[in-house]
Amino acid sequence: MAGPDSPQQQQVEEKAEQIDDAELAFQGINMLLNNGFRESDELFRRYRTHSPLMSFGASFVSFLNAMMTFEEEKMQMASDDLRTTEKLCESDNAGVIETIRNKIKKSMDSGRSGVEIVDRLQRQIIVADCQVYLAVLSFVKQELSAYIKGGWILRKAWKMYNKCYSDISQLQEACRRRSSDQQGALASDQANHNTSTGSGGRVTDEVLDRLKGSVSFGYGLFHLCISMVPPHLLKIVNLLGFPGDRHQGLASLAYASESKDMKAPLATLALLWYHTVVQPFFALDGSDSRAGLLEAKAILQKKAMVYPNSSLFIFFKGRVQRLECQINSALASFQDALEFASDQREIQHVCLYEIGWCSMIEMSFEDAFRSFERLKNESRWSQCYYAYLTGVCQGASGDLEGAKGVFRDVQKLFKRKNNQIEQFALKRAEKLRKVSLTRELCILGVVEVLYLWKALPNCSSSKLQLMNQVLQGLDDQSSIGLKHLLLGAIQKCLGNIKDALQSFQLAAQDEYGRLNNSYVQPYACYELGCVLLAKPETLSKGRSLLLQAKENYAGYDFENRLHVRIHSALASIKEVVPH
């Protein structure tokens, strides 16, 4: 942890008046990622009136703190900080929204310098970034009016990103032409694009590259997030004018991560988040949960010297190890990250969550119980969900009376009625509270969440065999369909495709599930479809089952989650067999 008088902080502060704000902001973000959250916050706040960029840095740290805590006071503070930064960026005049092209023309007419062009571009990008973060804070409230407001804020931000991205690209092209042509084209480019203003100064390639990196972070993240919107919501998204090109998003984030902009380290984290969390969870590359790991490992190796003890980078190293089924190594990494984050409670909670999951994967139920119980008691995010995980792990370890007590707590901790995870936790806890509880039913609950969160592929063959053995001996009639779905998923992970197909077919025929609108049937259809897609002779049948899962069921748990996976699977067919 970087201390208050650490050499790293002293070095940054000594340079504060000697270097430009772009470099100071870049170093401030690096300080944050090297476990210096408090020091980074202090640095940005000390210089927040120094420039729009430093003001944005202070507001970003405030936003990050709010998103890690979900505390109302911190979210309000972040909103106030972001609006203050917006006002600072718009303070010179109201023309921040005006097109850059007109500004360049005016700049030429009035003899303004190229430095002012850069300043105006930077301000526009910052305003767009602030708009996005304000929209996110609005979405967190989970109210209809907040969604509508957030959507329109994002629309405004997207237009600004798109315009800035286009104009910076044009300026870069003008610079390249100027460099390659030392005669007539040089004068023409300078006149048309004002990339040099004589005595006023020139917009250099280096400055434009940093600006391109700055806009590419928001531009890329926008593309990536919109590309993951459930298909049935895409019409609404398209009405707002948002695109959703995943490849463009990844390319833009990769560009941003290599730039000298302050958001370069954040773009790196966004790429790691996508490759190790989003991609395997939503099955964005078919059923291969290891897709993207090579990219993630390359990023971690490249940044190891820059962030040797960063709790966040060590956390993502643990995610890679978990996805590679190196669970003991993953546990060690998460434990290291937990210790390095000793001063940052929220990062500790993320690490504890992963330790709990790795323990479930290893069927070390007592260790999982301890992690989730601590989260239930300390975290302000979804104590209801953590209570359910605590209960099933406690029951799976053999403490059935303790588990019953925790399941009773789930009802008291249920707060967010529109949250599908809390709804699921409440329903499952109520069911387990009312039946004659057994260790096997609790293990069924553990295997179920491992399946729903795409963690079964991370389990070793020996643990999968043990899960299979427990489920085979379960005879609870209300859980028959779920039992067959999970047995099919286990057999699929073990490579026993014939047995997997048989179990998925039994799950798809589950009458109890149909009457209770369970997710079992649509998920079983999806699983059957994915297995059949693997062979050319059954591809058509597989596609038909995917469409059946998509169109014949509605209103079940985790519907949006399945729709994203179905959309990805259907898209993979189009790539192989283009229409």
UniProtKB/Swiss-Prot annotation:
Query: Where do the TPR repeats start and stop?
Result: 311-344, 349-382, 481-514
Keywords from UniProt, A to Z, are: Repeat, TPR repeat
Species of the source: Danio rerio
Specify the domain of life of the species encoding this protein.
Answer: Eukaryota
Matching InterPro entries: Iml2/TPR_39, TPR-like_helical_dom_sf
Q: Which ranges are annotated Polar residues under compositional bias?
A: 182-197
Of which family is this protein a member? Belongs to the TTC39 family.
The membrane-spanning stretches of this chain are none
This chain is encoded by the gene named ttc39c
Protein name (Swiss-Prot/TrEMBL) = Tetratricopeptide repeat protein 39C
